From Swiss-Prot:
This is GPI inositol-deacylase. The active site is at 222. The lineage of its organism: Eukaryota, Fungi, Dikarya, Ascomycota, Pezizomycotina. GO terms for molecular function: phosphatidylinositol deacylase activity. It is found in: Endoplasmic reticulum membrane. Keywords: Endoplasmic reticulum, Hydrolase, Membrane, Protein transport, Transmembrane, Transmembrane helix, Transport. GO terms for cellular component: endoplasmic reticulum; endoplasmic reticulum membrane. It is a multi-pass membrane protein. Belongs to the GPI inositol-deacylase family. Disulfide bonds: none annotated. Its EC number is 3.1.-.-. It comes from Phaeosphaeria nodorum (strain SN15 / ATCC MYA-4574 / FGSC 10173) (Glume blotch fungus).
Amino acid sequence: MVREKAQVTMGSTTMDMLEDEVVKAQDRRWRLRLRNPWACSAYTLVTTALGFAAFFLMLQSFLTKQLDTKGCEMVYMRPMYSKFDDFDTEHTRFASKYSLYLYREWGIDEEFTVKGAPVLFIPGNAGSYKQVRSLAAESAYHYHNSVQHESNAGKGERRPLDFFAVDFNEDFTAFHGQTVLDQAEYLNDAITFILSLYHTPGRSRRDPHLPDPTSVIIVGHSMGGVVARTLFTMPNYQANSINTIVTIAAPHARPPVSFDGDIVRTQNAVNSYWRSAYAQDSAKDNPLQHVTLVSIAGGGLDNIVSSDYASIASIVPETHGFTVFSSSIPNCWTGADHLAITWCDQVRKSIVRALYDVVDVSQAMQTLPVTNRMRFFKKWFLTGLEDIAEKTLPMTTEATLLTVDVDTAILPQEEQLVLRSLGRSSPNIKAFLLPVPPRDRGEKIFTLLTNERLDGPGEHGRLEVLFCSMSSAQSTQSYLTHLDFAGESPTATKLACKNAASDVIILPESTSHSNFPFRPDQAPFSYLQYDVRDLAQHQFVAVLDKVAHHSAGWVVAAFSASSEATVKVNPSLQRLLYTGISLQLPPRRPLTTEISIPALHSSLLAYDVHISRQKCSQGELFAPLLRQYISDLYESKFFVNVEDAMINVHGRGRPTCRAALSSKSPSNGLSLQIWADPTCDSSIDVTLKVDFLGSLGKLWMRYRIVFAAFPLLVVALVLCQQFRTYDATGVFISFAQSLNECMYSSLPLAITALTFLSITLATAQMQSKKLQALGGPASIIGAFFDNDNELLLGSEDPFFWFLVPLFGIMCTAICVMVNYVVLILTYLFATLYALVRSNRLLDASGQRTPDAFAVTSTRRRIINTLILLSLISTAIPYHFAYVVLCIVQLATCIRGFRLAKEAQLDTNYNFYNYAHSIFILMLWILPINLPVLVVWIRNLAIQWLTPFSSHHNVLSITPFILLVETLSTGRMVPRVRPGISLFTNVFLFAIGAYAAVYGVTYAYVLHHLANILCAWLVAIHFDTLGLAFEDSSKGVAVVGGRSEGKKRP
């Protein structure tokens, strides 16, 4: 009996031991799984694969799809520069850092004395003063060859343009707000010095009867355009010393990067200053009342600064400036990349000719009044087809007396004039009169297209167009020109006429041999378009064929109903995406047809357009010509001899860009204007479809900053899961395992919540715009809900809700990649570290012993920290210290990984996983600090040692220093009580939420949020407030390989 009881007891004990072993084995497997740094679940693997597939498709689309053709002509010049050495420290405190130069063109103007109107060129980010040479050389040649021989009739008195340029030693203004302010201060001093040259004996050869200049014309490239607008906000700005600014590829709407707080605050302050100035009720209260600003953008070829940011619609009213794309500029018609736009021959010629037209050296301000300046800027930079384009016909005098035989010259009402070959008309019929229809017959437009240049008053060319009315009884001597096409006809009638050449619109030539609109060897078309209301004072349109012999010139002209010339397609955006647009233009149609699609206004979508070729029995006069345009930024693109065209736009719907001022007319979306030969009696099929793959590439230029900010949301959620598990179980799981767990819990919830938030914000933004458009009290309510497109991805269309999960997947994939790259580097460096120290880690018996963290004395650590902080407060920016801390933290990770592998203790693995995760967090904060560090290093290279006060704030780096220094001793963070762990979650949630909602616009704040988190972790480490468990000190300090804790199998 006793024996049986003993056997039962032994069996029970054995079973208990077996159960304990099973539990221990399960616990070991659980701990092994949680601490595996290479863990990757199937869900994580699929998400990573999808993320990288989308990312590489986006890059492939950006590099190969929907690309504009490069059409800039190369330029040549023979530059000469003169440095103003006497512009020294007596004039500016930046004399040792920056320099001022005067440009002259060798062989044209070699005298380094001022003689005309001053123009100051401001280079952009890392730009050179030598970039002025293309504009200045063209200015010298244009004045030498043309301007000095032209009449000043209708214009101001003109002299050569004196081009000055500043050498900023290739400063990085895009990264550093203080550099922008320094350059602005220097430029104001330079302007004062430049103006003083014009009344300095020996420096000026200006005509004595001309007044001394009191203002300078500014041309700014890239960030130089932003600096130009900053000049007005500086204390040393001299009132009215600037009244004309032309910027090229300048990011006016937003800073190109938001990693530096100073650049964000500076540009926001400058934009607010300009908005408030133009918002004044009285012109006397507006310090910018005499200032005009034209912003020229390069379009899709600019891969450095998105041309969306070149918009000044939210800063300057249309009365004082506008934004235009180089593809819209007459005789240019091509996009340009960020650097090419400074030397592009077509662009520089338009800029120089516009500047000469607005110059008036007889005035002290050196320019014409604002209204005249704007008229000439519109003439040179806009197509002439825009709503704000001004017609000069009403202001033109009747300078031509035309005598015609009305019996043979007048065409029947509503008949189309077609001259297929100029010079073939009967000798008795050289003038063709189209009767202007009465206004009571509905809305009409007059259009005329020809491949010939239209003659101006008194010119003896090949074709002239006049708008005529019956001559009054005034003397014929008052007319400048007399044209007699009637001979001895008894029905001769005299008509008083105005010449239409000043309103001609230049269009690129489109024939069956045309390939691109910007070919310099092609003569452009001449186009006229008037609303019949503009012709109310006239009875006839006279087309004069002045060619004596048969020629290849042709003319098409007619009055047509406005309703026939406009087709409005207004389906929803969703329907357009699924089915596209298909429509047919009838055989009998006007010369030009405009297709308006209000739903297509987003710059995030790209489209493919196909236009079928029409059949012509007599042959086409010209091939179809397509113009795509969007009125928000006056962006036009022309496609000649078109069958297939790639359409992409900039404008409304652009992310993180503020809406236009109230004076700006609402957008009509994408419009397609087609010129097709109306003599061909055949229909034209037009189809438009969304290019989904091409659209994907548009995300890169608009959302590059997302890939620096959004991953911090993922990192914050991973850290939150790690601390939650550690405080509950004592196991600090690996970053990879925590990411796996987040894939099933917090990450999908966060992305879903952000998706709904994006829909809510976009809907509120749309409603806000509608309410503000109504005016009155509704506009006040609308302004309250207006978020200026600063939140999340900045889109104002709820349709793009899918961008949040799309970027969430891509950023998660990037986080996975970065984690594994860091692991690989840690493994490689740890292996190398072990090989170097292998001979030093043998005990007395020759056996290897685990490596140990070297623990310095507290006094020495305090001294080192104080020395570093003193250097930060005086000599080095905290961004430099942050980079050093990242290197130190990487070394800590390497040592922690090696120790964990050798000691195989749970506490060592806890510490390594903790140190690794902190390093991942610091690594994602690193890009925010690098740009300012680059600026500091650049200043050291040019021996500029003046510190920037905003970058020596020790509080911005002290928590990072203390945390990294603590981790370098191998000290593990203690576990905290459940109530206290809530604060850790709150700090991490704040980082993640801010990164997602505000990270794109205010990325620099993420450094400070991470700094606060570090301060909290330092407080937990030192446990000065009793935050940790009472037994938290047991097994948490990693001191060599003698740490307590469970040993891993």
